[in-house]
């Protein structure tokens, strides 16, 4: 999933204090000739609240086992997100499936203006001041992936100056 982004820094979970947030648990049913077989799927976001975040999906016949599998999956997908203080560096849009997410920087003290799955991802990253708008599909899995799409497109001012071969001052003042 992350190969289409050039500047994605994959992170190993060892040595990080990761906190996990449960985004959703869904009860699923498989109908067989012997009756119904119930199972659960869980979506979890893990992060160190300092720019490192990952998401995972776990499935099992037991809720706690599904959550544990999701946490393990999330730890395999950790990425580093560039932050601007405790907000996002610039406005960015992300898409996945039918879900679209817009993230906009906010001034200090604004808080996380986001709902559901988007809020879980942003708080796990360590973003404290951001405005967001979620449109289209409200499926938690697609919304989480759309939020990751937006976050992975973010670039810090330093990265932009290096890529363009200009000074950091010129990036800010034009």
Curated annotation (Swiss-Prot):
Keyword RNA-binding belongs to the record: yes
What SUPFAM superfamilies does the record point to?
dsRNA-binding domain-like, Ribosomal protein S5 domain 2-like
The UniProt entry's GO CC annotations, sorted and at most eight, read:
small ribosomal subunit
What the record says about family reads: Belongs to the universal ribosomal protein uS5 family.
Annotated function: With S4 and S12 plays an important role in translational accuracy. Located at the back of the 30S subunit body where it stabilizes the conformation of the head with respect to the body.
On subunit structure and binding partners, the annotation says:
Part of the 30S ribosomal subunit. Contacts proteins S4 and S8.
Q: Which PANTHER family match?
A: MITOCHONDRIAL RIBOSOMAL PROTEIN S5
Question: What is the protein named?
Answer: Small ribosomal subunit protein uS5
Source species of the chain: Flavobacterium psychrophilum (strain ATCC 49511 / DSM 21280 / CIP 103535 / JIP02/86)
């Amino acid at each position: 999933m992350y190969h289409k982004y050039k500047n994605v820094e994959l992170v190993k979970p060892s040595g990080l204090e990761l906190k996990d947030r449960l985004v959703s648990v869904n009860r699923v049913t498989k109908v067989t000739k012997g009756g119904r077989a119930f199972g659960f799927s869980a979506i979890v976001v893990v992060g160190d609240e300092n720019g490192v975040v990952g998401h995972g999906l776990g499935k099992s016949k037991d809720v706690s086992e599904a959550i544990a599998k999701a946490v393990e999956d999330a730890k395999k997908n950790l990425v580093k997100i560039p932050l601007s203080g405790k907000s996002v560096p610039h406005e960015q849009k992300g898409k996945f499936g039918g879900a679209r997410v817009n993230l906009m920087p906010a001034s200090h003290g604004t808080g996380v203006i986001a709902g559901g799955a988007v809020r879980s991802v942003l708080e796990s990253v360590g973003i404290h001041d951001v405005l967001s708008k979620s449109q289209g599909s409200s499926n938690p899995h697609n919304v989480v992936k759309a939020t990751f799409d937006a976050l992975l497109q973010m670039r810090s001012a330093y990265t932009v100056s290096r890529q363009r071969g200009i000074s950091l001052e010129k990036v800010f003042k034009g």
